[in-house]
Amino acid sequence: MAIGVGGCCAVLLAAALLFSSPATTYAYDSLDPNGNITIKWDVMQWTPDGYAAVVTLSNYQQFRHIQPPGWQLGWTWQQKEVIWSMYGAQAIEQGDCSMSKEGSNVPHSCKKHPTVVDLLPGAPIDLQIANCCKAGSLSAFSQDPANSAASFQIIVGHSGNSNETVRVPKNFSLMAPGPGYTCSRAMIVKPSRFLSPDGRRATQVLMTWNVICTYSQFLAQKVPSCCVSLSSFDNDKTVDCPTCSCGCRNEKSTTGKCVKKNAPDLQSIIHGPGRWTWQPLLQCTSHMCPVKINWHLMLKDKEHYRVKITVTNLNYRMNFTEWNLVVQYHPILDITQISGFNYKSIQVGKINDTTMLWGVKPYYDLLMQAGPLGNVQGELIVRKDFRASSTTNNNKGRAFPVRVYFNGDNCVMPPPDAYPVSITA
């Protein structure tokens, strides 16, 4: 048990998730300007040589989620702190605890720069707390707000045990599981307050500090990770993803390694030595993107377009759980009906021209690895808004999206002059 704070933490944690709200910060994405992951430390109780705290990671990004192998949270202690024990998460290294006194308990971690990960589902009950043990996954806030947060409890020693003697950690880092996030300094804020279930009593923690982490696709990777192709029922030509959208095929380089989909040794390569690594093994294409989205115009009449969207995974070593698309389209269009997808409109400023799509459970929410099952499909019926159309000077390519995001990453679009001619005429 957690030094007498297990029950207290469970109640306060539930209240924290209910009453917490997104913190405002500057982000990198114009479609989600306030998106961030907020890390909140709530000191619940002082201990003889430190404190017990509940740490909560809240994903306030509207359409970017974290999937297994999940988040990794790191920091640097400012004094000689140790982690006596943890619940709901674990430090990946114990470090050198040889300075522990004989006969005393050995700390969970003595690292100056600890890195913490979530526990897996099915972890022992006595190591769990509320909202833990999801293999590091954090759902996007718009897609599944109930699963957009994770928590763990940490018992810290050799740290001081008062507001005056505790030094907040520094140099926070968040991997998800790769790079891309930049974290702020820890800022001491007003202690979190919670209401009792009956709403008649308010309590507050002893001390709270926040860290805000924002994402940059540029920091995460040097090349894009998805691309868009366009096609139409009344044109035989498919406008494919631009060549080298996500890199160029080069069998002599590591980043350009790929395997042909009809290679006779395909299965042995997929299940070879690199099977358990997170290095991508892509199907050879002209664009070399791990994910391809095809926007196909199935039908058009005076008032509507009917569109089929196909999302194809071209990575043999990764599937995508809780994937999502964000589609920004021309203001003259209005989505009226959707099949196979859940959807939510995203208001960007005063213009409502962006929609978030994700797969309906349990049929389309998992995008399998490259192969016969490595795609998901859905259909849209889009109504033309003639009032907006009359004020729009350039309706060229209006049946096609302006921008497409996959799991929060901006996908490479074909150039406008390459759109199917019959639609742009």
From Swiss-Prot:
Keywords: Glycoprotein, Signal. Glycans are attached at N36, N163, N171, N319, N352. One of its GO terms (biological process) is cellulose microfibril organization. Residues 1-27 form the signal peptide. GO terms for cellular component: plasma membrane. Belongs to the COBRA family. This is COBRA-like protein 4. The gene is BC1L9.
